[in-house]
């Protein structure tokens, strides 16, 4: 692999010999709540195989950047990344500063553009699953659907 272009919480991106491609290395680094916790043997390989499975399973729905892989290294088409992470939540739970319950317990009723009612209890099942997007950066910040569009992460079309 050539020069490293980016080192994230879990993945590293390297130049490829072909300027239209990149290498994405999924490491064994375990990250939680925007912090590196430890290394977990074979985590990178397993995550890469899950990605390969999902890219292949969904390519008939939407094109993706996947070309090939060897162990924990993907070869991908160079493209512009979509720096939004989507979390699907079925319960109002958690105990960290980033958890839905922590925000709710501190009085936040509009989270990621979703209005939550009063009187929810910790660990309560939500009436229906909700999607709570966050920015993908050093620190993941909650963002609403409207802000995703207004900040030009994506268009409405």
Q: Where do the PLM segments sit?
A:
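Active-site loop/lid in soluble adenylation, ligation, and acyl-transfer enzymes
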Residues: 1-137
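A short mid-domain helix/strand-loop element embedded in enzyme catalytic domains
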Residues: 126-157
């Amino acid at each position: 692999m050539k020069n490293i272009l980016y080192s994230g919480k879990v993945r590293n991106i390297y130049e490829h010999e072909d300027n239209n491609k990149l290498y994405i290395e999924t490491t064994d680094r375990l990250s939680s709540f925007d912090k590196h916790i430890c290394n977990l043997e074979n985590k990178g390989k397993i995550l890469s195989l899950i990605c390969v499975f999902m890219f292949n399973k969904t390519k008939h729905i939407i094109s993706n950047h996947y070309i090939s892989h060897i162990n924990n290294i993907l070869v991908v088409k160079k493209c512009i990344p979509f720096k939004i992470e989507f979390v699907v939540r079925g319960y109002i739970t958690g105990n960290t500063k980033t958890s839905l319950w922590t925000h709710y317990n501190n009085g936040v009723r509009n989270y990621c553009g979703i209005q939550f009612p009063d009187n929810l209890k910790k660990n309560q099942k939500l009436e229906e699953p909700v999607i709570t997007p966050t920015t993908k950066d050093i620190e993941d910040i909650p963002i609403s659907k409207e802000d995703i569009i207004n900040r030009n992460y994506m268009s409405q079309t």
